[in-house]
């Protein structure tokens, strides 16, 4: 991609250094991706100059006729993608979306039941350092010994706790989520159901994962992971009464003026997601993840839950390579492979060290990786981690880094990916 040219040379240098890092590194962080040139240009447009508190047709500022058109188009495209009646595209992030949705569904101090962090949940699903664990009364469900959701156990827990809200969805769960079963549990105990599909939204759009529409009362997501759009959040529902409450919590509850330039980037990405190419891309993401994980399994590497049904998986590096997640991710970074340490179920090392490393395929699939490249990448990572205490580690790292650079040169970042 073309390097940026600014009058502010300090910022120019840093941005161009980051661009070079992105070009020369293999990106395995499951929550990251590369946007198209069109998304990038819309997000960096003159729309950043316009303030537009409120919603289309009901703004507190004049001169919003064109930003109204953009936000309306984003909403209509999003509704079409997920076949929903109502949508809000203003949240600045997935966390912002969750905060507004939860506030609309539960009063402060109310009970919420979400997935525990070490089992694959997210901070905003009730973790103590998040708003959801500070202003609400959080409880958690986990996974069984196989790393799978046990819906019978979750049902019994819900019957005991009687939460006002159940949150389903995860930031690190590699298997299919049964939204219908969650819905039955929520209805049985009289709870609202919130589906956080931030990681799997693109797969749902492509009909490669069951949709929560028709099962969840409210659906939240980010727009920059598998949707491959501008960074932000969205909220959807088929319940008009709930959606009106959510809209009020987004604005004026938690946010002021929306980021119109980001909403434009979201709208462009939603348009791209409506194309046949987008479904092929999502299919390749899953095929790559399966091939990638199977290559690790060939040498006995432990995959949490045993396999992947989606775009990510986590390897237990502690039991497989006798190395912590922090050490493993730092080693990988030293040879230009970017991933992230991640807690695993019943992790004894804590989130800052952890026993796992999460692997995601969306970003490198965008750059053109197929199964053969991911298999080669797995072998590079295995060789690195298996020799973490070798006396020849530095020379090995140099060799493997050169192999990584060969891959990144063969699959450069491009101006347009579709």
UniProtKB/Swiss-Prot annotation:
Keywords from the UniProt entry: Amino-acid biosynthesis, Cytoplasm, One-carbon metabolism, Pyridoxal phosphate, Transferase
Catalysed conversion reaction: (6R)-5,10-methylene-5,6,7,8-tetrahydrofolate + glycine + H2O = (6S)-5,6,7,8-tetrahydrofolate + L-serine
E.C. designation(s): 2.1.2.1
Site, Plays an important role in substrate specificity: residue positions: 224
Location of N6-(pyridoxal phosphate)lysine modifications: 225
InterPro entries reported for this sequence: PyrdxlP-dep_Trfase (IPR015424), PyrdxlP-dep_Trfase_major (IPR015421), PyrdxlP-dep_Trfase_small (IPR015422), Ser_HO-MeTrfase (IPR001085), Ser_HO-MeTrfase-like (IPR049943), Ser_HO-MeTrfase_PLP_BS (IPR019798), SHMT-like_dom (IPR039429)
Biochemical pathway: One-carbon metabolism; tetrahydrofolate interconversion; Amino-acid biosynthesis; glycine biosynthesis; glycine from L-serine: step 1/1
Co-factor(s): pyridoxal 5'-phosphate
Gene Ontology annotations of biological process type: glycine biosynthetic process from serine; tetrahydrofolate interconversion
Top-rank EC class of the record's enzyme: transferase
A GO cellular component entry from the record: cytosol
PROSITE patterns attached to this UniProt entry: SHMT (PS00096)
Location of this chain's protein in the cell: Cytoplasm
SUPFAM superfamilies xrefs: PLP-dependent transferases (SSF53383)
Function (record text): Catalyzes the reversible interconversion of serine and glycine with tetrahydrofolate (THF) serving as the one-carbon carrier. This reaction serves as the major source of one-carbon groups required for the biosynthesis of purines, thymidylate, methionine, and other important biomolecules. Also exhibits THF-independent aldolase activity toward beta-hydroxyamino acids, producing glycine and aldehydes, via a retro-aldol mechanism.
Record note on quaternary structure: Homodimer.
Record's protein name: Serine hydroxymethyltransferase
Native source organism of the sequence: Mycoplasma mobile (strain ATCC 43663 / 163K / NCTC 11711) (Mesomycoplasma mobile)
Gene: glyA
């Amino acid at each position: 991609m073309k390097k940026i040219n600014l009058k502010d040379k300090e910022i120019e240098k840093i941005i161009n250094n980051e661009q070079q890092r992105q070009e020369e590194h293999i990106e395995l962080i499951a929550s990251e991706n590369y946007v198209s040139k069109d998304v990038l240009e819309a997000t960096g447009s003159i729309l950043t100059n316009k303030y537009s508190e409120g919603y289309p047709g009901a703004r507190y500022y004049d001169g919003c006729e064109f930003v109204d058109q953009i936000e309306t188009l984003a909403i209509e495209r999003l509704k079409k993608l997920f076949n929903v009646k109502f949508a809000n595209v203003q949240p600045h992030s997935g966390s912002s979306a969750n905060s507004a949705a939860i506030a609309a569904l539960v009063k402060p101090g109310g009970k919420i039941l979400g997935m525990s962090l070490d089992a694959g949940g997210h901070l905003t699903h009730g973790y103590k350092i998040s708003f959801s664990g500070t202003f609400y009364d959080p409880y958690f469900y986990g996974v069984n010994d196989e790393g799978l959701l046990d819906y019978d156990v979750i049902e019994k827990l819900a019957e005991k706790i009687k939460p006002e809200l159940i949150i389903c969805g995860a930031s690190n769960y590699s298997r299919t989520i049964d939204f219908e079963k969650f819905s039955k549990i929520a209805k049985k105990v009289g709870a609202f159901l919130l589906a956080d599909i931030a990681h799997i939204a693109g797969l749902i759009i492509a009909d490669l994962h069951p949709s929560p529409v028709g099962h969840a009362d409210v659906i939240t997501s980010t727009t920059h992971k598998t949707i491959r759009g501008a960074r932000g959040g969205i909220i959807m529902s088929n319940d008009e009464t709930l959606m009106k409450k959510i809209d009020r919590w987004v604005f004026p509850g938690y946010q002021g003026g929306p980021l119109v330039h980001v909403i434009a980037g979201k709208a462009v990405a939603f348009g791209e997601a409506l194309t046949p190419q987008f479904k092929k891309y999502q299919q390749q993401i899953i095929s790559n993840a399966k091939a990638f994980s199977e290559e690790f399994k060939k040498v006995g590497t432990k995959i949490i839950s045993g396999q992947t049904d989606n775009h990510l998986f986590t390897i237990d590096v502690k039991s497989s390579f006798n190395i912590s997640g922090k050490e493993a991710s730092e080693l990988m970074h030293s040879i230009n492979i970017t991933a992230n340490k991640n807690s695993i179920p019943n992790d004894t090392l804590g989130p800052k060290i952890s026993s796992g490393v999460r692997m995601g395929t969306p970003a490198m699939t965008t750059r053109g990786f197929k199964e053969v490249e991911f298999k080669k990448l797995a072998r590079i990572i295995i060789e690195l981690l298996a020799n973490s205490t070798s006396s020849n580690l530095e020379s090995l790292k140099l060799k493997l880094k050169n192999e990584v650079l060969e891959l990144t040169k063969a699959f450069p970042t491009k101006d347009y990916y579709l």
